[in-house]
């Protein structure tokens, strides 16, 4: 149980990653040492029985590390294996240490393995449920490439490859269980599918322990929220499980900026506002070009209306007359599009940062918004957003096409209804961005109209 992460804010029931007993989806992480093929002697697999020295282990006050040793002994071979889980305060990384002591008369061999066995629950994607947008399923990293796996594909072509310096993971929105094998030798990565259940395994090379010798094997687990600072330290590029999709290259630095803003403000909501303003400032030269084009089009509004009235029955002549007007006034009606297109990947990347980052989960902002990852309970932000979009529409030139003009009129209402079910952090970002755009466009319109009046 992740006791610091309630399933529902304000309730005591925590998020539970693994499940083997209830009626919910089966999900376990298994570790052990397996014997050579054909060897019928006992080995400490995940099915073996281990003994604990105490019925309960607690992290003592003033201590930052808790070691939980479990012991397996095979009288026939004279081998004792101590399997120690090492927990650290405030960390979701778990170090796994095997100490193999061979007191027998013959060499003893075993290979370490770790595996994730999980039911694949198919979620029907819904625009009103952001949980369905995040990837949920198996993934691995081969030292170079990060790969998300589809269960249906693995059923047709099972995964089987040798990897050194990688990891495997079972992913879901905001949380992950990951296995990071020792990087000192290649491990065999496999995935098998039985119905809707998958088994993702990493198996190491066979290790031999001579009579009278003691050997130690070390592996790493990570079980918990996708806290990127901790993920980076737990395994090579393990922070990739904070999955921003194809916009990762842009999203990573944006998340870093958001973290720095949070260090200043101590509040993720104010951090969103601060970074939104920073992005607006960075892109001001580009958005100013777009704004100037729209402002000039707005000034020409009455003249365009006259042309529409004059050539209302001849669309060909209307188009020609409008192009001549644009040429005389040195206006390119498409000039404002390119700056917007250039900015879109950055804003979509920021969207994914807010959607995927566990730091936003149940993070409070203001009085009525106590969870930036959930919808606004009173729909205040969507209403403000709709009002801001309407003001923005009024600042822009009226479309020549009456149908298009009506579409733009009702767009704020449509967007507010849609965003009413989105996480309030996303709505906050969009609302602040719209309000900053209004301020910028109003200032540009004022300057363009003042310059026009001076010439007239």
Annotate each language-model stretch with its function.
Residues 1-240:
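Soluble non-transmembrane domains of integral membrane proteins
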Residues 98, 111-112, 117-131, 194-198, ...:
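Helix-loop-helix
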């Amino acid at each position: 149980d992740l006791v610091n992460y309630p399933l529902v804010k304000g309730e005591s029931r925590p998020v539970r990653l693994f499940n083997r007993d209830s009626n919910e989806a089966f999900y376990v992480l298994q570790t052990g040492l397996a014997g050579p093929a054909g060897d019928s002697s006992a080995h400490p697999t995940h099915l073996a029985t281990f003994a604990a020295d105490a019925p309960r282990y607690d992290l003592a006050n003033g201590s930052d590390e808790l070691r939980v040793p479990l012991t397996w002994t095979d009288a026939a071979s004279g081998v004792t294996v101590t399997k120690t889980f090492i927990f650290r305060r405030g960390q979701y990384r778990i170090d796994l240490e095997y100490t193999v002591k061979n007191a027998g008369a013959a060499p003893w061999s075993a290979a370490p393995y770790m595996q994730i066995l999980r039911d694949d629950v198919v979620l029907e994607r819904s625009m009103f449920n952001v949980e369905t947008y995040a990837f949920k399923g198996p993934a691995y990293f081969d030292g170079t490439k990060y790969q998300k796996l589809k269960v249906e594909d693995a059923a047709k072509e099972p995964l089987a490859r040798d990897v050194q310096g990688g990891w495997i993971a079972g992913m879901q929105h905001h949380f992950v269980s990951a296995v990071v094998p020792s990087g000192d030798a290649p491990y065999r990565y496999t995935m098998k599918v039985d119905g809707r259940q998958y088994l993702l395994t990493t198996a190491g090379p066979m290790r031999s322990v001579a009579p009278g010798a003691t050997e130690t094997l070390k592996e790493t687990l990570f079980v918990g929220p996708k806290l990127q600072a901790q993920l980076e330290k737990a395994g090579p590029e393990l922070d990739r499980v904070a999955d921003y999709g194809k916009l990762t290259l842009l999203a990573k630095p944006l998340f870093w900026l958001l973290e720095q803003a949070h260090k200043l403000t101590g509040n993720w909501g104010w951090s969103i506002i601060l970074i939104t303003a920073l992005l607006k400032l960075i892109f001001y030269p580009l958005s100013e070009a777009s704004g100037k084009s729209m402002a000039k089009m707005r000034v020409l509004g009455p003249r365009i209306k006259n042309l529409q009235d004059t050539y209302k029955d001849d669309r060909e002549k209307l188009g020609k007359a409008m192009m001549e007007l644009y040429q005389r006034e040195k206006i390119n009606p498409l000039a404002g599009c390119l700056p917007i297109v250039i900015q879109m990947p950055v804003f979509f990347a920021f969207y994914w940062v807010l959607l995927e980052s566990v730091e936003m989960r149940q993070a409070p902002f203001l009085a009525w918004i106590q969870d930036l990852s959930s919808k606004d309970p009173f729909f205040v932000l969507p209403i403000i957003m709709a009002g801001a979009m309407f003001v923005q529409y009024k600042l822009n030139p009226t479309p020549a096409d009456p149908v298009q003009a009506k579409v733009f009129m009702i767009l704020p209402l449509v967007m507010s209804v849609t965003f009413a079910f989105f996480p309030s952090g996303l709505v906050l970002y969009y609302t602040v961005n719209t309000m900053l755009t209004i301020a910028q466009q109003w200032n540009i319109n004022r300057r363009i109209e003042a310059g026009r009046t001076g010439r007239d």
